[in-house]
From Swiss-Prot:
It catalyses: a 5'-end diphospho-ribonucleoside in mRNA + GTP + H(+) = a 5'-end (5'-triphosphoguanosine)-ribonucleoside in mRNA + diphosphate; a 5'-end (5'-triphosphoguanosine)-ribonucleoside in mRNA + S-adenosyl-L-methionine = a 5'-end (N(7)-methyl 5'-triphosphoguanosine)-ribonucleoside in mRNA + S-adenosyl-L-homocysteine. The record marks 190 as: Involved in formation of the phosphoamide bond. It comes from the Viruses. GO terms for molecular function: ATP binding; GTP binding; mRNA 5'-cap (guanine-N7-)-methyltransferase activity; mRNA guanylyltransferase activity. It comes from Reovirus type 2 (strain D5/Jones). It is an enzyme of class 2 (transferase). This is Outer capsid protein lambda-2. It is found in: Virion. ATP binds at residues 892-899. Outer capsid protein involved in mRNA capping. Catalyzes the last 3 enzymatic activities for formation of the 5' cap structure on the viral plus-strand transcripts, namely the RNA guanylyltransferase, RNA-7N- and RNA-2'O-methyltransferase activities.
Length: 1288
């Protein structure tokens, strides 16, 4: 693909090859044109492409004789009026013509086009025209008739011996709306009077002799192919100018430009069987070339005309309707820097045609053309395919050549950078609340308030306030109170009273809302109230009423909630009071306010009721107050963090208020708060590193945008600076997404590239010694317009997908494991080599992948090697260094590709690594670390074939189990320590993501956290110190670790997520139910006996010596208890309101609730229908009240104590679908869902449930408390019968 200065040409040739025959212009044709009948008018309306207003008219014969000033014609300025005016004038002129030349005698007589144009022009300007009528019909030839005329026609024609001078009439006229707007059509100076003169003669030789003695400095133009109306030269005027911003061009250039564009359009449209009016539309320069330089527009248009005649095509299609904007851009490209990269150069006296040009104009039969046998273009013949414009920037993947330059050269082209600029900020986080919670669990260790973590001392420092503010501004969400309230209610309504088996919070309760505000957009009350009352919050039944209290209420009572007030009693009090309103940032004042609010909540809650209180600043003093004043007077509690914005605010939920108990804080609360504060500190630190909201990006921030703009880009050796600039952007931004736009801007065609710099890309750039240069080919071939958009820092409005979030989690683990100078061997690197952005720039790296790398080579400052091979093959690793081996998201695919089991692939992986000098292996494995459950839509697990299926990608991989993988490791490395790297819920992994300007999505994070359980990271310290496990590492059971090789003075720490679970330095402070540590001097080993109350991954660390050096000992997994569950139904079912008791056998660790699946969505079943309680023998009993509708619904028992409801247990209650209903006693009947249902008794329809205006049969009664799955659907008591239900 060649460039001619800034004009990009296509890589194929095309020309019209079939020419239509000329047809003589007869008097019949002339009169038909004067009729101007609809659809056959001798003009064409031209519109502004933005407004669609008609702003100009293109004129055809016989209207091309308008040579006087516009005011001489008296034309109306609006097209509709102009058209009426002209049609009336032409109609009158036709009758004048027919009066002299009756159609009956002159119908086929040939008309002199020169005279026809002049006649119409004179008539429309009210000039004398009768002298022209005798010349209308051709006697000899058009030219000779006028040369021999004895009348004075100097206004239109002049004779110069054998040469006839004809004034060029307008080809366009402007309407009032024409303003030379960017979207107006270009008129090429042909709307001006006297823009050119035409000189006609029977032979070109006579014309040449004429111009020997006349001034040709303006440039003499010629149509060699089928010159209109005869051989002629065209002399444009230098005084008539037309604007093509930023250029002003004269009439000669304007005419060349128009003809050149027309020929390029004809080339693109050419087809073998499609005739063209003219094979070569171009004007060529016949005289005057000596007056133009190679940098002039005239000369360059001459080159383009030559190329168009030879069949070259523009790489970028010409729009069907030209605009001034497009033309300005085209002229700007013509005049930009560069060179003519084609072998064609214009000659003054003839047009050279290449030997292999598809054009059939030829000097053998046509004057002015010479085919050059020695001139060959070597291009294929094919019309260019027109591509549609693209409305938004398109992603671009850079590719590299072996060329390099100095890194400093990239800084030298800074003039192409668009920095500083003010980008849009976008959203760093989208989606609903990411909720975390903990509730009271009596199996947990008792913890005092003083042992709970304290609010960070720096919380009110200025930089932390800035971080919170930035996160809040860049967090895209609707009404934040609504989102938080909804999340809190969903969790609170799931809590179950173990003494009754029913939820604490149920439908129809009275509710008080403390802190209600009328300041919500579009409502004069908190936005949660209306959907709550209407039962539209999934899993949250509607209350009987909600009364509002607070400073800013509109539908309630104004009151100071921190002081006693006559509120009345409510079964549920929801307090959304902010301590910052009265307490600001004074912790003592705000803590006292919390205590007052908690007291008000207690006073307003009826016995056995519940309340929620928001705590903005959870300090130990508040926990101590709750411990002393609240916990003894409630039966259970829950702490919820609906993570919407980054702060330490939590919601405390109290259940069973005013009932005595011995509740305490627990280790679960301790772990929850540790994660909570770590999560806040992590995101606060990240936010403080991000640029400020609304910032001006000058390139100094670690995270930001890189934008370069290249006008009229070419990629020849003449525009090396452009290539260096693009390469510098790629070096600055690494693997960040890059987008390109190619568009018109102020007369220039612009290439804009946008990407993002980050600490990760800075690491990669710091590794470079030289600047690798990109291959511009993929940019060169772009001929489309790709529209730009305003650069956005966080651009993904939907947020990262679950798979991207999962990858970010792995990236964090890799970056955390590698230290300065570590030699890294990365397996399954991928073409993008992300590893180079994760490890220190001082760390040598060997990257191995079966696919070729897309990274440059030979440009690195530190040894960086790329090997293309199968890393599961033998022999290749000899001599390859690697202190730490990393392998992420690769081994499963490699096993699938080789049709191996995961065990076999992992064994070969270990065998290969064992031949190296590696100390650490960090590998992502396909291995469940928890109860096997599919992740809907993302991960399907086939336990029979031991395969993972990824439906989003249409692939599957094998998986293994933890024991097998550990056994394979220890068989090769007996003394290794193995760590199953836990996923921390403090979100520390988001640092890399957010600093790379990746938008996170709450739902995606939840899914990625689930997937991580089945695709964990395994760390093997090959030369570590192993732990020996004994006993059952199951929640609530005794287990022990034996750790040899340490001294009695050494200490062992155990971590659960981010929190310290216990330390042997003080086992009494342990956060697990039981731990004892003993040292055997004889065996020189430690034994740790433990009981755990939380399932998950625990990591062990030894602290040795006077320097307290940490040594990783590996990890172990504490499993949840057995998930087996059975339901034993009695032989005789009870269809009365007493219900049927069903014995449930399940481990008491699990808390259960009944759910129903409606339209594929889980709904909590009505607690009045299903009740769980402990029987006298200590077993679990489920009481269910039976309904005819049960046969038509899918009920399940699901566990509710995990972060994911139903993660461990989803047990179908299949008997409900198969029960035989009695026909001799009253039964209960509800609608199975909200649709209309036909109720049939013995096959006869007796009524339609849920129908409009439904009235139950007279022998039906309504049950006071519904036992339908939904509390909003009534239950009827129906007489004995044989009932069936049919949906309508």
């Amino acid at each position: 693909m060649a460039n001619v200065w800034g004009v990009r040409l296509a890589d194929s040739l095309s020309s019209p090859t079939l020419e239509s025959r000329n047809r003589s212009y007869t008097l019949h044709d002339f009169c038909s044109d004067l009729d101007a009948s609809a659809g056959k008018e001798p003009w064409k309306a031209l519109r502004n492409q933005r407004t669609s207003e008609i702003v100009a008219v293109r004129l055809f014969r016989p209207l091309q004789g308008l040579i006087l000033d516009t005011h001489m014609y008296g034309f109306p300025g609006e097209f509709d009026a102009w058209e009426v005016f002209v049609k009336e004038k032409l109609r009158v002129l036709k009758y004048e013509v027919l009066r002299v030349y009756p159609i009956s005698g002159y119908s086929n007589s040939h008309v002199n086009v020169f005279v026809a144009n002049a006649l119409v022009g004179a008539f429309l300007s009210n000039q004398a025209f009768y002298d022209l009528l005798p010349l209308l019909i051709i006697n000899d030839t058009m030219i000779n008739d006028l040369l021999g005329a004895g009348v004075s026609l100097a206004q239109f024609f002049q004779a110069h011996g054998d040469v006839l001078e004809v004034a060029a009439g307008r080809k366009y006229i402007q309407m009032n709306g024409y303003s030379n707007d960017d979207d107006d059509p270009p008129l090429f100076a042909k709307d001006l009077s006297d823009y050119a003169k035409a000189f006609y003669c029977e032979s070109f030789e006579v014309l040449d002799r004429f111009f020997w003695t006349h001034d040709a400095s303006a440039g003499v133009l010629v149509h060699y192919d089928k010159p209109t109306n005869g051989n002629h030269y065209l002399l444009g005027t230098l005084t008539q100018m037309v604007s093509a911003p930023p250029f002003i061009i004269n009439a000669t250039d304007a005419m060349m430009l128009e003809s050149c564009v027309e020929q390029f359009a004809a080339n693109a449209a050419a087809r073998p069987a499609q005739p063209a009016t003219r094979l070569d539309q171009c004007y060529h320069l016949r005289w005057g070339a000596q007056y133009v330089g190679e940098d002039s527009l005239t000369y360059r248009l001459g080159v383009l005309s030559l190329l168009a005649t030879n069949g070259y095509q523009l790489a970028r299609p010409i729009p069907k309707q030209l605009t001034n904007r497009w033309l300005s851009s085209f002229v700007s490209q013509i005049m930009s820097e560069g060179a003519n990269e084609t072998p064609l150069w214009p000659q003054e006296r003839y047009v050279q045609i290449a030997y292999d040009s598809p054009s059939v104009v030829d000097g053998a039969v046509q004057y002015g053309y010479v085919r050059k046998n020695q001139l060959r273009l070597g291009m294929r013949i094919s019309p260019i395919q027109s591509l549609s414009d693209v409305p938004a920037p398109v992603a671009w993947l850079p590719q590299y050549t072996i060329d390099q330059t100095a890194l400093e050269d990239g800084d030298m082209v800074g003039h192409m950078s668009q920095l500083p600029l003010r980008p849009e900020y976008g959203s760093m986080w989208v989606g609903e609340a990411l909720s975390y919670y903990v509730d009271y669990n009596q199996s947990h260790r008792v913890v005092a308030a003083k042992e709970l973590p304290q609010l960070p001392d720096t919380y009110f420092d200025g930089d932390e306030q800035y971080g919170r503010s930035l996160f809040s501004l860049a967090r895209r969400i609707g009404d934040r109170s609504l989102i938080k309230d909804t999340a809190v209610l969903k969790h609170a309504y799931q809590a179950i009273d173990p003494s009754t088996g029913r939820e604490y919070l149920r439908a129809g309760q009275s509710v008080a809302y403390f802190g209600a505000s009328a300041g919500h957009s579009g409502a004069d009350q908190p936005l949660v109230i209306e959907p709550w009352l209407q039962g539209k919050i999934s899993g949250v039944p509607s209350p009987a009423s909600i009364r509002q209290f607070g400073y800013d209420v509109a539908k309630g009572a104004i009151v100071d909630l921190a002081r006693p007030f006559p509120s009345g009693d409510y079964q549920f009090v929801y307090s959304d009071v902010d301590q910052v309103v009265d307490g600001h940032d004074d912790l003592s004042i705000s803590s006292n306010l919390v205590e007052s609010i908690l007291s008000s909540c207690m006073q307003a809650t009826s016995p056995g009721g519940s309340f929620v209180a928001k705590i903005n600043f959870p300090t130990r003093s508040i926990w101590y107050y709750i411990e002393q004043k609240i916990l003894p007077n409630i039966t259970s509690y829950m702490i919820i963090k609906p993570f919407v914005t980054n702060n330490v605010e939590v919601f405390f939920v109290a259940f069973g208020v005013h009932r005595q108990s011995s509740l305490t804080w627990t280790s679960g609360v301790y772990f929850f708060l540790v994660d909570h504060f770590y999560r806040y500190e992590t995101l606060s630190a990240i936010s403080r590193q991000l640029p400020s909201y609304g910032y001006v990006d000058d390139g100094s921030s670690v995270t930001g945008l890189e934008v370069i703009s290249i006008e009229n880009p070419g990629f020849s050796t003449m525009t090396q600076a452009s290539r260096v600039a693009i390469s510098a952007l790629c070096a600055n931004t690494g693997n960040s997404r890059k987008t390109i736009s190619i568009y018109e801007s102020h007369g220039a065609r612009v290439l804009m590239l946008v990407s993002r710099r980050s600490p990760a890309s800075a690491k990669r750039k710091a590794r470079l010694r030289y600047l690798p240069l990109i291959d511009p080919r993929s940019l060169e071939v772009q001929s489309r317009t790709i529209m730009p958009s305003t650069p956005v820092l966080f651009e993904n409005s939907n947020g990262a997908s679950p798979h991207v979030c999962l990858t970010m989690m792995y990236n964090y683990e890799v970056s955390s494991a590698v230290y300065d100078g570590d030699v890294v061997l990365d397996l399954g690197t991928g073409p993008e080599a992300k590893i180079l952005e994760l490890i220190p720039p001082t760390s040598p790296a060997t990257c191995v992948d079966i696919r070729p790398t897309a990274q440059p080579t030979g440009c690195w400052n530190v040894r960086t090697t790329f090997l293309q091979l199968d890393y599961l093959s033998d022999g290749w690793i000899t001599g390859v260094r690697g202190d730490i081996v990393t392998c992420m998201l690769s081994l499963g695919a490699a096993a699938a590709g080789k049709s191996m089991t995961f065990d076999a692939a992992f064994q070969q992986f270990v065998r290969v690594i064992a031949q190296s000098a590696a100390n650490v292996v960090l590998v992502q494995v396909n291995c469940p670390t928890d109860v096997i459950r599919s992740v809907r839509g993302y991960l399907e697990i086939d336990q029979t074939s031991k395969r993972y299926r990824f439906p989003k990608f249409g692939r599957d991989e094998p998986y293994s189990d933890m024991e097998s993988l550990e056994r394979i490791c220890r068989a090769t490395w007996p003394n290794c320590s193995i760590t199953w790297v836990p996923l921390s819920y403090d979100l520390r992994w988001t640092r890399l993501a957010l600093l790379e300007a990746a938008t996170l999505n709450s739902a995606s994070i939840r899914i990625a956290e689930l997937m991580y359980k089945y695709m964990p990271v395994m760390r093997v310290d090959i030369h570590g110190l192993p732990m020996n496990k004994s006993g059952n590492f199951v929640v609530g059971q005794n287990c022990s670790l034996t750790i040899p090789g340490f001294n009695a003075q050494d200490t062992f720490n155990c971590y659960y997520n981010s929190a310290l679970a216990f330390s042997t330095e003080d086992v009494n402070a342990a956060m697990i139910p039981s731990v004892t540590a003993t040292f055997d001097n004889a065996k020189n080993e430690w034994t740790l006996d433990m009981v755990f109350s939380d399932a998950g991954i625990y990591t062990m660390q030894a602290v040795v010596g006077v320097n307290a050096s940490p040594i990783a000992l590996g990890s172990f997994v504490v499993d949840s208890p057995d998930v087996d569950i059975t339901d034993a139904w009695p032989a005789q079912l009870d269809f009365t309101i007493a219900g049927t008791d069903v014995d449930i056998t399940v481990n008491p660790y699990y808390r259960l609730m009944a759910f129903v699946k409606i339209d594929g969505q889980w709904q909590i079943a009505n607690p009045d229908k299903f009740q769980f309680f402990a029987s006298a023998t200590g077993t679990l009993t489920m009481n269910v009240k039976l309904d005819i509708a049960d046969k038509y619904l899918l009920y399940y028992i699901r566990d509710v104590q995990s972060r994911e409801v139903g993660f461990y247990i989803q047990h179908p209650l299949q008997l409900l679908n198969t029960i035989t209903l009695p026909t001799n006693e009253d039964l209960f009947l509800s609608a199975p869902d909200m649709r209309e249902w036909a109720v049939k008794e013995s096959g006869n329809t007796i009524c339609i449930l849920n129908s409009q205006g439904f009235i139950p049969p007279q022998d039906w009664d309504v049950l006071t408390d519904t036992i339908s799955w939904s509390p909003s659907l009534p239950t009827y008591v129906v007489p004995p019968g044989d009932y069936t239900l049919t949906p309508l």
